[in-house]
Amino acid sequence: MSGHEDATHPPPDSKGSRLPSRTPIVVTLRGEAGAEVQIELVGRAHPEQQDYWDGNWLRTRVKVRAGGFRGEFEPELRAEEFARLRDGVRVCMADLRGTFVFETLEGQLEITAKGDGLGHFRAECRAEDVAGIGNELTFTIDLDQTYLPPLASQLDAALKAFPVLGHPGA
């Protein structure tokens, strides 16, 4: 270790993560009846890049459970998409009529959850296994406000491990 590192703050690994590679980073939108969208962040797609446009692509593994459907695919998603989702979830934790959105640049995973003001949320979701030309699954996940704090904490951990790099105007 150099003089600037310690065991609690390891340097970035070859995948651009600041956590040991054995530590999985998972973000899960859970709902009623076992429905969920689980996103495992595997690493940066271009760890050698530090700019906004190339450096923020993340390799992920997405698992979907909705009713009788199960599926898994491996899209590349962007760090700032997780930041926008986290910000929206935090708003909804305070405003039960709020909406949080996960909208991806290539359209492979879309989630829009709206609150009814009483603590219930309905997430309208769409997953596409190949960007622009793939098979598509649309589904809903019903959840309540108690699912939001753990989701926000997972998003905080994801963004700590894979922070947004640079700025779009740079």
Where are these regions (language model features)?
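Intrinsic, low-complexity N-terminal interaction/targeting segments
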Residues: 37, 51-59, 101, 108-135
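DNA polymerase processivity clamps
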Residues: 44-51, 94-116, 166-170
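Beta-strand elements of well-folded, non-transmembrane domains
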Residues: 64-68, 79-81, 127-131, 145
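Generic detection of short hydrophobic beta-strand segments and adjacent strand-loop junctions
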Residues: 27, 73-75, 100, 137-143
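Short amphipathic alpha-helical signal-transduction/dimerization elements
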Residues: 89-93, 159
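Mixed-charge, glycine-accented linear interaction segment located at domain edges/termini
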Residues: 128-170
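Charged, alpha-helix-forming regions
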Residues: 2-51, 55-67, 71, 75-77, ...
